[in-house]
Amino acid sequence: MEAFTTHTGRAVPLRRSNVDTDQIIPAHWLKKVTRDGFEDGLFEAWRKDESFILNRPERTGATVLVAGPDFGTGSSREHAVWALQNYGFKAVISSRFADIFRGNSLKNGLLTVVLEQKIVDALWELTEKDPQAEVTVDLEAREVRAEGITAAFELDENARWRLLNGLDDISITLQNEGDIATYEAKRPSHKPRTLQV
C-alpha cells in the first residue's frame, strides 16, 4: 500500500447525497478479485449521461472527490474503494460516510476525510467556480486547504499511522514474520499450521 502524507490535486464536486456502493460500482463488476481494472465501472450508470461531472473534460485527472453526505452506504464491497482508486482518487471528502465503507477505504489506502457540511459546501462552490482549483489534504497536519479554506479533520491514530506508513493488514502481519516462523517451528506437528507455498 502506498503511504499517504500530503496530497494536492484538483477536485470533483459530487453534489449527491446517499451515494451507495452499488452506485459507486455496480454488482456486475464484482466478479474480479484483483484490485485493478475497475475505473470504467466507477459511477457506471451516471457516466452514461454526458453531462455527469466525471464526463466533463475539465475534470480529467482530478484526484480529490468532494461528495455529499452519507457517501458509501449500502453493501460492503472493497470494489467500491478500488474503483475510486483505479480512477485516480487519492482522497474523498464528505460530511458523513457509511462506517463500513470508511473502514474499507482506510484499510485499502484511500483517505476519507470528514468535514462539516458548510466546509464541503465551500469546497463545492470553489471547485465549481474554478475547476483548476487545487485542494490539499494534509494527513500529517490533519488539515484540508484550498483557496480561502483551511479546515482541520480528525482521524483515529491507528488509521492515521497505517496510512502515513503505507501499511495494510498483510504488511503489518509481515512485520512479525520472524516471530510467526519461530512460533510455527515450535508448534507440534499434529496441530494445524500454515505452510509456505
Swiss-Prot record:
This is 3-isopropylmalate dehydratase small subunit. It comes from Streptomyces avermitilis (strain ATCC 31267 / DSM 46492 / JCM 5070 / NBRC 14893 / NCIMB 12804 / NRRL 8165 / MA-4680). SUPFAM superfamilies: LeuD/IlvD-like. One of its GO terms (molecular function) is 3-isopropylmalate dehydratase activity. Pathway: Amino-acid biosynthesis; L-leucine biosynthesis; L-leucine from 3-methyl-2-oxobutanoate: step 2/4. Keywords: Amino-acid biosynthesis, Branched-chain amino acid biosynthesis, Leucine biosynthesis, Lyase. One of its GO terms (biological process) is L-leucine biosynthetic process. Its EC number is 4.2.1.33. It comes from the Bacteria. Heterodimer of LeuC and LeuD. It catalyses: (2R,3S)-3-isopropylmalate = (2S)-2-isopropylmalate. GO terms for cellular component: 3-isopropylmalate dehydratase complex. Belongs to the LeuD family. LeuD type 1 subfamily. It is an enzyme of class 4 (lyase). It holds the Pfam family Aconitase_C. Catalyzes the isomerization between 2-isopropylmalate and 3-isopropylmalate, via the formation of 2-isopropylmaleate. The keyword Lyase applies.
